[in-house]
């Protein structure tokens, strides 16, 4: 069970604006030692915004002379009506494929009408590139993302999901813009946990969340009987987008989204179909041919991998462990280099198999199938 340390106290900081466009926070908390300190914050350009709030490139200083950073500060409005796991996750889970939280603080400011706005501020490592922008870098220039890059980013996303799912946490809004990447090294990190949920018996589950293009069929049907496998569906949509250069399914409503999905997967299956193995085999064969048509440039094992991810029945979707062991990732197990975009020199792959003790426990019997053989 994750726990949030109550380090803020009862009085959030009032951001004191100084003359040279930085402000002073007298109660900022370091994640490394959980100690409070006083720091100056200077915000630069805005690098993200949405219904959640804003993200700005920022630097910090204890004396307004020597500055640390850059960092990314995500500022969200604090609401008693909205319970978020974001701080719990960022504060308690340290993982190479999850964005790192460095500091955090609460603040408040006065609105134009004289009211008060209370905010949470997450000071995170600064990684300016997203998987979404990387996809556009390739396809806007008339090229395609290399297969090895697709597999490299996919494996790291799965590794992040393995950790979250082993704690019964679903991310809830997995999409290319929520995957930070460092193209020169091939590193990928999942970010934005504002929609994350803990799926246990004591949680009242919501049904309207996750960006529509990446929303699992069970969510589109307003089912409350869902699992962490909704993230696996979203991952399948992300893989398809890396292959094709645009979202796989682009509906403008829940119903039209299901219609778009049906163009690839066929109509949503009736329960009676499961009782006919012959019919099921026929449908699977048709689906495989349709996948080959939609993704003509990928190989047999890659199509088979997608079939294990993009399936209506959540119980038939492979989980993170099973997918990490798939032949789809053999190129990452058998080779040690990749060629970054725009580079003529190969570089070492990031360390993909440096699993922690908790990851090894979560992998269980799959561990030996995932790590490269010593032969």
UniProtKB/Swiss-Prot annotation:
SUPFAM superfamilies: Protein kinase-like (PK-like) (SSF56112). Its EC number is 2.7.11.1. GO terms for cellular component: nucleus. GO terms for molecular function: ATP binding; protein kinase activity; protein serine kinase activity; protein serine/threonine kinase activity. It is an enzyme of class 2 (transferase). Residues 41-329 form the Protein kinase domain. Gene3D superfamilies: Phosphorylase Kinase, domain 1 (3.30.200.20), Transferase(Phosphotransferase) domain 1 (1.10.510.10). Keywords: ATP-binding, Kinase, Nucleotide-binding, Phosphoprotein, Serine/threonine-protein kinase, Transcription, Transcription regulation, Transferase. Belongs to the protein kinase superfamily. Ser/Thr protein kinase family. This is Glycogen synthase kinase-3 homolog YGK3.
């Amino acid at each position: 069970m994750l726990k949030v340390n109550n380090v803020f106290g009862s009085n959030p900081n009032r951001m004191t604006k100084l003359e040279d466009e930085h402000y002073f926070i007298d109660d900022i908390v370091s994640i490394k030692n959980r100690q409070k300190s006083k720091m100056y914050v200077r915000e630069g350009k805005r690098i993200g915004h949405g219904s959640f709030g804003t993200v700005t490139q920022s630097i910090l200083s204890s004396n307004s002379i020597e500055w640390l950073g850059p960092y990314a500060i995500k500022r969200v409005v604090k609401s008693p009506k909205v319970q978020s796991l974001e701080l719990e996750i960022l504060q308690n889970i340290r993982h190479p494929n999850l964005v790192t939280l460095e500091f955090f603080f609460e603040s408040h400011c006065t609105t134009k009408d004289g009211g008060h706005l209370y905010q949470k501020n997450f000071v995170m490592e600064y990684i300016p590139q997203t998987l979404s922008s990387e996809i556009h870098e390739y396809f806007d220039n008339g090229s395609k993302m290399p297969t090895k890059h697709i597999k490299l980013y996919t494996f790291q996303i799965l590794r992040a999901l393995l950790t979250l799912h082993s704690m019964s946490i679903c991310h809830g809004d997995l999409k290319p813009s929520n995957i930070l990447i460092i193209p020169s090294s091939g590193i990928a990190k999942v970010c934005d946990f504002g929609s994350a949920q803990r799926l246990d018996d004591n949680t009242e589950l919501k049904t309207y969340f996750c960006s529509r293009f990446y929303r699992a069929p069970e969510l589109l049907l307003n089912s409350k009987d869902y699992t962490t496998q909704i993230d696996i569906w979203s991952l399948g949509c992300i893989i398809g987008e890396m292959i094709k250069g645009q979202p796989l399914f682009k509906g403008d409503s829940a119903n039209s989204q299901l219609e778009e999905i049906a163009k690839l997967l066929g109509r949503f299956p009736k329960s009676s179909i499961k009782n006919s193995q012959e019919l099921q085999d026929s449908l699977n064969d048709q689906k495989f041919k349709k996948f080959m048509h939609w993704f003509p440039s990928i190989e047999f094992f890659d199509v088979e991998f997608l079939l294990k991810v993009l399936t209506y029945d959540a119980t038939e979707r492979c989980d993170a462990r099973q997918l990490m062991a798939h032949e789809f990732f053999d190129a990452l197990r058998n080779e040690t280099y990749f060629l970054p975009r725009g580079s003529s020199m190969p570089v070492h792959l990031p360390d993909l198999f440096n699993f922690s003790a908790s990851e090894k426990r979560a992998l269980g019997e799959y561990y030996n199938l995932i790590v490269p053989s010593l032969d």
